[in-house]
């Protein structure tokens, strides 16, 4: 059966990763969490006190401790830097609040985009991020751009943090998400924007199942047309 590549983009906490993981499982596709890759670079930078001008040192650390993905016993995805599992460490608030400046460094983006393209070259990949449809996989057969209100996204992030045992304040999350939106959409390199041929879907008030159904039906239609 012919497979396709699926690109899902959108701002922070728009539901990209949750939806992408479910669709990947349903279609037996590989899910690539590009956001986790930028979080890994951010985690390394913070661990060593590096700033934007230390790009060569951050790239050196990424070469020494390559990013890889695994699966936990419950089937959830795990993230590694070298031999260290960083699945939860890269979701801490300090990483979340610094990932924008790290992901805006052109050399970091170039390195991670090249890694992402290598993984996707054989197809049957579902990838989520902020520039998948525009930069990483411009030839993806299906491109989705998810949006949602700041309030809704802050509520999702608050619940996620609670489930992971991460302390957070709802109003602080709202302001952080709004600030992240501004940074992501105004950066010089690969700003957050929908690809011209992307299907935009507002997930405000829509259940996860509803979003999954919307995207999966479109994916299956394209797959059927290829076979």
Swiss-Prot record:
Gene3D superfamilies: P-loop containing nucleotide triphosphate hydrolases (3.40.50.300)
CDD domains reported for this sequence: CMPK
SUPFAM superfamilies recorded: P-loop containing nucleoside triphosphate hydrolases
Catalysed conversion reaction: CMP + ATP = CDP + ADP; dCMP + ATP = dCDP + ADP
Keywords: ATP-binding, Cytoplasm, Kinase, Nucleotide-binding, Transferase
Alphabetical list of Pfam families matching this protein: Cytidylate_kin
EC number: 2.7.4.25
GO molecular function, one term: CMP kinase activity
Coiled coil region boundaries: none
InterPro entries noted in UniProt: Cytidylate_kin, Cytidylate_kinase_dom, P-loop_NTPase
Subcellular location: Cytoplasm
A GO CC annotation given for this chain: cytosol
Similarity comment: family membership: Belongs to the cytidylate kinase family. Type 1 subfamily.
NCBIfam families in alphabetical order: cmk (TIGR00017)
Protein name: Cytidylate kinase
Organism: Streptococcus agalactiae serotype Ia (strain ATCC 27591 / A909 / CDC SS700)
Gene name linked to the record: cmk
